[in-house]
Amino acid sequence: MGPGDIRSRNNVTVHGNGHPTLVFAHGFGCDKHMWADVAANFENDYRVVLFDHVGAGQSDLSAYDSGKYGSLDGYARDLVEIGEALELPDAVVIGHSVSSMIGALASIARPDMFTQIVMVGPSPCYIDDEEYTGGFSRQQIDELLTFLEENHLGWSAAMAPQIMGNSERPELSERLNRSFCSTDPDIAREFAKVTFHSDNRNDLPMVKARTLVLQCQQDIIAPQAVGEYVNANIPNSEYRLLEATGHCPNLSAPEEVTEAIRDFLHPSS
C-alpha cells in the first residue's frame, strides 16, 4: 500500500509546516473532528496531522478487517504506516482515551518516529483486579458491551452525557452523541470490545518517549487513580491534573488542553 493509499484509508489531512509534527488521534466513537478545537491552535507553529481510525469518520470502511483490528496493535500499525507515509521523524502523538495506548504501542514499535506522547484521559486497563483499580468491574464492562450490542442508538444517548460530564453544557454531550450515532454499529461494537477488554499495563514500562499524562477530574472512564498509575509506570512521564471535568476535555476545555500541550512542548528551563 502506497503513501497515497494510506492517506486515503485513514482520511489523513496535514496543515502547517512547522516542527515537530503533531499527530492527533481520536478516541472510541469519535473522528478527527473531535480534535479540531485544539489542533487549530497549533497550525501556525507546527505541522499538524489529523486522521480517522479505520471504521471511523471518513476513513475507508472497506479497509476494515476484524482480524487486524481485533487488538489495539492493528490500530498502532496504522499509526506507524501513517508516519511512514508522511516520512515523520521525531513526531509527537497526541492521543485521546484509547488512542493514548495506541500511541504508546506505536512509539514502542518506532521510538525514532514518535519521540513524545501526550495522553489525554488514558487507561491501560479498564477492569479492576486485586492489585489495580481500572474503574469498572468485569460485570460492568460486560453489561456495557451487551447494551451497546443490543441498542447502539440507546447506548449512545445514555452514555454520551455520562462520558462527557459537564451537565450544565448539554450541547457537549449532544455533540458526542451525534458522533457515536454516526459510527458504523458493527465496527463500533468490535472497537468497543477491543477497547474495554484491552490490558496494556505491561507495555507502559517499554514506552521510552517523553510523555505527558493529562488527567481530568470527575472522569468516569479514566479515573484519577488510573492516570496516576500510567504516569508512575512510564519511565519518562509527567502528570498534569486539569481543571476540566469529564472524559473529553478536547471538546469541553480546548483552551486548557492547548495550554498544557504548549507547556509540555516548551518546558521552562
Residue ranges of predicted features:
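Conserved HGGG/HGGXW glycine-rich cap/lid loop of the alpha/beta-hydrolase fold
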Residues: 10-68
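Conserved alpha/beta-hydrolase "nucleophile elbow" surrounding the catalytic nucleophile
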Residues: 26-28, 91, 95-97, 216
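Catalytic active-site module of serine/aspartate enzymes centered on a nucleophile-bearing elbow/loop
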Residues: 237-269
